[in-house]
């Protein structure tokens, strides 16, 4: 059953998104094509930086998967979600300044540019590019599934139709607007998410008959829902440590977060970004997860936990308002996909194609065409991948997240802070981290009860230090030639 009152605000929202992308295309006159298309000519201020980092970091799993888990495991999961609070501070604090200064010095546009300038190894860049593409395709498929599920539940649009509407609109606006469109949309989407979260939470508390009544109802359903350990006693110390490493500390190693650290304007922007970003993450994480947990008092018998937020929207808000705030999780999903789509197309063009054919760097018309075409083709592949979705998407997302962290975290952090780090060390760290994570995650091996990310990062660090012994010191990093 398609609901027009819900669909109309959504159409209006998509039009705003396209409007911002057209504006971004018009602005695209300054600087060279690569710098502008993939980095917005490094011109982000504090508020925009905070919003784009937050919107990129907060994805379908925070708006759909996370509240779904809170619905299933109770208030303990809300507490667990707050572990993510320092994520913005960690990524901007540890990478931020140093990363941006070096990126400007090397004239780097992508993360792999930074890795090449630092370690000067082609093999390392190829390995990094391939692992990035594989993991991103996994992560973006999750976002596509999330978007289509949302339209299916809240607006009554069939899953396949929703998937097509969703996929086509994202691929188009990312392909033509580039990084500037992505960042402008993130800022607008961050605002929508904030307002949407607060209104929805108020609506749920009201529908449950007040906060204390909601908690009593949860206790009646299952006393474990209001205990710190959560239902099924899932929140053990090892689980919480693993979760913190995966979604907070490890975020430093996520390529689409790291590239946001290259593209801001000045150090005032970073300081402001850290403060605003942390506040926004706090409100969104607490609000959405609490909404999911308390939602069980309003709708106790959902079979697919991932559907909790869209179902609640339709239940506790009037249809028109539901349409407006359906835009909030849509925003979360879109902002994450466009960051990852851009990163993937940047990887294919800059790190693979221009490495093989460096003479093409001056051919801006061809690069423009290729960027758009590659983004659209990736969009089409993702549509195919998302056609038959699994039941709970949070695990699929965490799988892709962990793979990226296992490969990129140490080469990035040690490359910035350890002068003697060399290519042999970075390569051994990447290979050990990536392979170990893939094996542990595929066969669901949890050593001492830890998530695969914990042993993978520890052994990857060890492999880095040992491998470093056998490598040559890296010569002084060079400027990347001809605005590559």
Question: Model regions: which residues?
Answer:
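Membrane-embedded helix-loop-helix hairpins and adjacent transmembrane boundary segments
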Residues: 1-484
